[in-house]
Amino acid sequence: MASTNMASATSRFMLAAGIPSGANGGVSSRVSFLPSNRLGLKLVARAEEPTAAAPAEPAPAADEKPEAAVATKEPAKAKPPPRGPKRGTKVKILRRESYWYNGTGSVVTVDQDPNTRYPVVVRFAKVNYAGVSTNNYALDEIKEVAA
């Protein structure tokens, strides 16, 4: 006695009815059954409005240049100034809960993304209790010092 899995049989079936109906005012609808790895069956239904013909654009006069032919180049936007101290700068740590509070370290890198909360990576000569020698700080938690 052989058993047949109906989900696998119908997953290969695809129905695309593109017949416009008069009741919908010329709106065509499509229904598709596509194979899916998770459920074995996926239903997709779309309704489309008929597209209206775009009005023809008037031809440009003989003495006018088309807009596409005009070579106007937009000036490139200037880059914003870099955030934070430069790489290698010595900084003092102002975060009270930090292991390196009032200590100095050198800047490894600064993330330029404005959404980054702690963009400045600082490396220290001394390791903390966990054996770590770097930490991230916010721009207001560090102060540049003379080397």
UniProtKB/Swiss-Prot annotation:
Its biological purpose: Stabilizes the interaction between PsaC and the PSI core, assists the docking of the ferredoxin to PSI and interacts with ferredoxin-NADP oxidoreductase.
Start-end of Low complexity biased regions: 50-61
Region Disordered, residue ranges: 49-91
Keywords linked to the UniProt accession: Chloroplast, Membrane, Photosynthesis, Photosystem I, Plastid, Thylakoid, Transit peptide
GO BP annotation list: photosynthesis
Keyword set includes Transit peptide: yes
Recorded topology in the membrane: Peripheral membrane protein
Presequence extent in this chain: 1-46
Family stated for the protein in its record: Belongs to the PsaE family.
A cellular component term, taken from the record's GO annotations: photosystem I reaction center
Superkingdom of origin: Eukaryota
UniProt organism field: Hordeum vulgare
Protein name (database record): Photosystem I reaction center subunit IV, chloroplastic
Entry-linked InterPro entries: Elect_transpt_acc-like_dom_sf, PSI_PsaE
Chief localisation class: plastid
Keyword tRNA processing: no
Compartment(s): Plastid, Chloroplast thylakoid membrane
